[in-house]
Amino acid sequence: VRPHRTYFGEKDAQQLRVVRRMAEEQRLPVEIVGLPTLREPDGLAMSSRNAYLTLEERRAALVLPRALELARTIVECEGVRDADRLKEALADCIRREPRARIDYVAVTDYETLEELATINRPALLLLAVRIGSTRLIDNTTLAPNRSP
């Protein structure tokens, strides 16, 4: 079978970029299509891992979509461009949730995934957070050209 298109969720943004890059480098005749992250009504990204969360952990997991919204506000409304300043603000937000342990908070170039010091072009905010023993990932696009 030789597919013309393959679909990947944007929830795992790193995987999507790596697969796209591999397809380009190998000159594979396939279109890699990214699909938006599906979310629960309360904003938590849908994931098979959510089934491992207790009720209390499920509530605690809402710190991820809250952190994403905070990031968009800081960059797009307040005009902050310093990636370290943004990451520290998000780490503070996440640490307020006692059940959350940060694996990483990263700000990268939207396409290359290169870490950014300054958010001066389209970027990805990538989060990996453990809630109890369950590792959850999420991300959002940051658009620094949206003026406050």
Predicted feature residues:
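Divalent-metal (Mg2+/Mn2+/Ca2+)-assisted nucleotide/phosphate chemistry catalytic cores
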Residues: V1-Y7
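Glycine-rich, Lys/Arg-enriched anion-binding loops that position phosphate/diphosphate groups
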Residues: R5, D12-D103, T108
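Active-site flanking residues adjacent to catalytic metal/cofactor-binding acidic residues
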Residues: G9-E10, I137
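Fold-independent oxyanion-binding glycine-rich loops
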Residues: E10-K11, V129
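Phosphate/ribose-recognition catalytic cores of enzymes acting on nucleotide-derived substrates
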Residues: E88-P148
